[in-house]
Amino acid sequence: MEITLFDPIDAHLHVRENALLKAVLRYSSEPFSAAVIMPNLSKPLTDTPTTLEYEEEILNHSSNFKPLMSLYFNDDLTLEELQRAHEKGIRFLKLYPKGMTTNAQNGTSDLLGEKTLEILENAQKLGFILCIHAEQAGFCLDKEFLCHSVLETFALSFPKLKIIIEHLSDWRSIALIEKHANLYATLTLHHISMTLDDLLGGSLNPHCFCKPLIKTKKDQERLLSLALKAHPKISFGSDSAPHFISKKHSTSIPAGIFSAPILLPALCELFEKHNALENLQAFISDNAKKIYALDNLPAKKARLSKKPFIVPTHALCLNEKIAILRGGETLSWNLQEIA
């Protein structure tokens, strides 16, 4: 059995920087046609020149791959900088509530403040797409739910602004997407295939720790259902986020799952298991092209076959290792060719 996926798109990707970027980028740039690149680096991409420099770094270490750059929404963002980013072709604005995830200490402190709303009003006029890490302070399993009032305010106040709930993790958010025409979402492999049991049901597994947290069986099943039917308002976004094993085994564990090396085989396995392989093309590419109005992307064909694939336990970066999701396991699908 074989399947060919055309122009795979990852609508939420972390490729880090410097040596780590060089080590992990190929796992995404080779099989994927394009990816929305996250701006929460150690020095966040809060201005246009820095964002364009990072884009150039990615392009220098990849080929036939389109990085779709995003600007980090922060308290110091000005209307002039927003206009400058627009003029340089940056189409994505990434909003992190302050302190909610990795490198979000520079995030937005007042989500419904006058300045935030003014920036969003202008982002709407300029045609930006707002990608939001939709969590608010509160009990860890309710953080996304607690952000619903903010999402509703944004959706109603800016009806022409496309708003993406990044890495949807709570089944209660599905109703918002159905209710508001301008609300969309991305789904990760880990949120549609894993639950809290994978993180802490046995021994604590730091390599399954991410934000937002993987949640209950009900959440996983409801989100998986959206993916399997390729809901038209949902696109795939891996949120692949590599960290060194030495940091993952420390006393202060960073959030992030490195899934890039297994994405296409694991998705094929999951969709075949549920008799939905015919919908994988829409989930992995077609929906994103429509939602984000993407065209002129590098043409790419990823051919996969139903043959065993033993997942490497780790990737290497200098003298450090990066644990790969499901490392050491055997998947039933294998990436055979990229053209």
Curated annotation (Swiss-Prot):
InterPro entries: DHOdimr, Dihydroorotase_CS, Metal_Hydrolase. The modification N6-carboxylysine is found at residue 94. Its EC number is 3.5.2.3. It comes from the Bacteria. The keyword Metal-binding applies. One of its GO terms (molecular function) is dihydroorotase activity. One of its GO terms (biological process) is 'de novo' UMP biosynthetic process. PROSITE patterns: DIHYDROOROTASE_1 (PS00482), DIHYDROOROTASE_2 (PS00483). Its cofactor is Zn(2+). Zn(2+) 1 binds at residues 12, 14, 94, 239. SUPFAM superfamilies: Metallo-dependent hydrolases. It catalyses: (S)-dihydroorotate + H2O = N-carbamoyl-L-aspartate + H(+). Zn(2+) 2 binds at residues 94, 133, 167. It is an enzyme of class 3 (hydrolase). Keywords: Hydrolase, Metal-binding, Pyrimidine biosynthesis, Zinc. Pathway: Pyrimidine metabolism; UMP biosynthesis via de novo pathway; (S)-dihydroorotate from bicarbonate: step 3/3. Binds 2 Zn(2+) ions per subunit. Substrate binds at residues 14-16, 40, 133, 243, 255. Belongs to the metallo-dependent hydrolases superfamily. DHOase family. Class II DHOase subfamily. Catalyzes the reversible cyclization of carbamoyl aspartate to dihydroorotate. PANTHER family: DIHYDROOROTASE (PTHR43137:SF1). Homodimer. This is Dihydroorotase.
